[in-house]
Amino acid sequence: MWWMSRLTIMMTSLFLSFTLAAQAYAADIQMGAGGNLVFEPNEVTINSGETVTFTNGDLPPHNIIFAGHEELSHPDLAFMSGEQFPVTFTEPGDYEFQCDPHAGAGMKGVIHVQ
């Protein structure tokens, strides 16, 4: 019967690891969604400590620049479709971002962190 207690501990640990990992993920933002020079969605609201993943779409190259937050920015251009940049937000606030090559075309957005 000792193996049942070990099995219970292992199953509980596995469940908690999946649950905690799922809670940290907040949103996926597509860069160049549908071949357009847009972020989709271009506005999201998340909780502090959560992660937003930016995924390069069909129309590269793109980058992500957060005004006043160089530590969150990904200035290198993403050329490969499907390339991802995860960004974790630890402080509440409004974080405006843009794609530098396409900001003039309106490729901008904001993340609200509660």
What is the role of each PLM region?
Residues 1-11:
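Bacterial N-terminal signal peptides that target proteins for export
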Residues 9-19:
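Bacterial N-terminal signal peptides
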